[in-house]
């Protein structure tokens, strides 16, 4: 069995449905496929996202996939110093990813795209040396899907990007391992997300509590994947040390997060790679939903232009525009990440004491120049050659 579309999108996480919806809206035939039996499961995410994405990426603010509105964040240092960022208005939400992802695919379908769950991409189809489609299986039946443009939105492992000749390789140390419980938990302000830092708490990462209800939250951890201990070990250790019983677990999720850099060439002829498949993730906190939406938006713009003008070479502009915009920002964030990996617990204590909430937000977003300059004037920074050197490396 074979089908023909203008565009086939492999993967219905975040980036894939955004691309499929936008291209279908422009009047082109699109097929969005996902290997899972139910789009959106299992989740591999803490489910928090900025309130700004709904308007920016034209996504309905639908209470069906919003668990809780969030008004800020609270950061905790290794010794227990706290930094709170609290806003009058809603700053973010905790999603229900199992519903959210499915609704993104629904919006793509409503825009005109065909959507098929339980359809796994296996390989690319080549003709005269060019990629002309993909081999897949739909409900265990082999199919061939021919398309002018193929979009690899198939996650960190990205079979299709690799098969098409896009270099997506990254060494193991450029990934973090995550482990998360959705569980009943009390004693934390449910209007804030909570983050704990420390080299003994979460090496190269942090522990999070993202409230989904008054007494229910995603409680998870991210650590360097080459750590001799597992993420589960550190999370269970943190729960025990904080006298938090782990006896009311509603869901357990594990994941791998690319945090060490981004795929350089995002296009190979008529094949594009987006989202986690392109490692388009904020390396500071490991979140990638907003980044996937941005990449999907840029990619879909150039797909539409290339198809309208019947000039697939225009697809190369996706790589160019992404690196000039979000890629440039994320490279700055990666620079911060690499510095934070060298911080001692004493450093983390100091910075959480002296930074304001606005400062912390700027650093996490890559807009840190003025904040670093101010820190360089702090007496405890001036007295340490090592701290001075680390901070100056960011300027």
From Swiss-Prot:
InterPro entries: DGGGPL_reductase, FAD/NAD-bd_sf, Geranylgeranyl_Rdtase_fam, Geranylgeranyl_reductase, GGR_cat. It catalyses: a 2,3-bis-O-phytanyl-sn-glycerol 1-phospholipid + 8 A = a 2,3-bis-O-(geranylgeranyl)-sn-glycerol 1-phospholipid + 8 AH2; 2,3-bis-O-(phytanyl)-sn-glycerol 1-phosphate + 8 A = 2,3-bis-O-(geranylgeranyl)-sn-glycerol 1-phosphate + 8 AH2; CDP-2,3-bis-O-(geranylgeranyl)-sn-glycerol + 8 AH2 = CDP-2,3-bis-O-(phytanyl)-sn-glycerol + 8 A; archaetidylserine + 8 AH2 = 2,3-bis-O-phytanyl-sn-glycero-3-phospho-L-serine + 8 A. Pathway: Membrane lipid metabolism; glycerophospholipid metabolism. Its EC number is 1.3.-.-. Binds 1 FAD per subunit. GO terms for cellular component: membrane. FAD binds at residues 15, 34, 45-46, 48, 97, 121, 276, 288. Signal peptide: none annotated. Keywords: FAD, Flavoprotein, Lipid biosynthesis, Lipid metabolism, Oxidoreductase, Phospholipid biosynthesis, Phospholipid metabolism. Pfam families: FAD_oxidored, GGR_cat. It comes from the Archaea. GO terms for molecular function: flavin adenine dinucleotide binding; geranylgeranyl reductase activity; oxidoreductase activity, acting on the CH-CH group of donors, NAD or NADP as acceptor. The keyword Cell division does not apply. Is involved in the reduction of 2,3-digeranylgeranylglycerophospholipids (unsaturated archaeols) into 2,3-diphytanylglycerophospholipids (saturated archaeols) in the biosynthesis of archaeal membrane lipids. Catalyzes the formation of archaetidic acid (2,3-di-O-phytanyl-sn-glyceryl phosphate) from 2,3-di-O-geranylgeranylglyceryl phosphate (DGGGP) via the hydrogenation of each double bond of the isoprenoid chains. Reduction reaction proceeds via syn addition of hydrogen for double bonds. This is Digeranylgeranylglycerophospholipid reductase. The lineage of its organism: Archaea, Methanobacteriati, Methanobacteriota, Thermococci, Thermococcales.
């Amino acid at each position: 069995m074979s089908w023909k579309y203008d565009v086939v999108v492999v993967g219905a996480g975040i980036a894939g449905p955004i691309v499929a919806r936008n291209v279908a809206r422009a009047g082109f035939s699109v097929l969005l496929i996902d290997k899972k039996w139910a789009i959106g499961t299992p989740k591999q995410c803490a489910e928090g996202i900025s309130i700004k994405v709904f308007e920016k990426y034209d996504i309905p603010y639908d209470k069906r996939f919003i668990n809780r509105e969030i008004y800020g964040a609270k950061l905790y240092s290794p010794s227990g110093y706290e930094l709170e960022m609290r806003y009058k208005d809603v700053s973010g939400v905790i999603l229900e990813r199992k519903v959210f992802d499915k609704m993104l695919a629904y919006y793509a379908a409503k825009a005109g795209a065909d959507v098929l769950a339980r359809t796994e991409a296996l390989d690319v189809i080549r003709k005269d040396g060019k990629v002309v489609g993909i081999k897949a299986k739909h409900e265990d039946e082999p199919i061939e899907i021919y398309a002018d443009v193929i979009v690899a939105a198939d996650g960190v492992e990205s079979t299709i990007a690799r098969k098409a000749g896009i270099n997506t390789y990254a060494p193991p140390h450029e990934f973090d391992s995550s482990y998360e419980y959705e569980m009943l938990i009390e004693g934390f302000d449910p209007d804030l997300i909570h983050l704990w830092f420390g080299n003994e708490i979460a090496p190269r990462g942090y522990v999070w509590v993202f409230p989904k209800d008054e007494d229910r939250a995603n409680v998870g951890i991210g650590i360097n994947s080459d750590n001799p201990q597992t993420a589960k070990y550190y999370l269970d250790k943190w729960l025990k040390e904080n006298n938090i019983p782990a006896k009311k677990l509603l869901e357990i999720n594990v994941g791998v997060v690319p945090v060490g850099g981004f795929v350089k060439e995002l296009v190979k002829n008529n094949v594009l790679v987006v989202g986690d498949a392109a490692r388009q993730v904020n390396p500071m906190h490991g979140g990638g939903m907003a980044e996937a939406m941005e990449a999907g938006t840029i990619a879909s713009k150039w797909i539409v232009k290339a198809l309208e003008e019947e000039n697939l070479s225009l697809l190369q502009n996706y790589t160019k525009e992404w690196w000039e915009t979000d890629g440039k920002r994320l490279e700055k964030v990666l620079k911060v990440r690499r510095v934070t990996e060298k911080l001692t617990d004493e450093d983390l204590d100091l910075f959480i004491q002296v930074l304001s909430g606005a400062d912390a937000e700027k650093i996490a977003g890559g807009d840190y120049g003025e904040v670093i300059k101010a820190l360089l004037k702090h007496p405890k920074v001036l007295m340490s050659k090592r701290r001075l050197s680390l901070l100056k490396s960011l300027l």
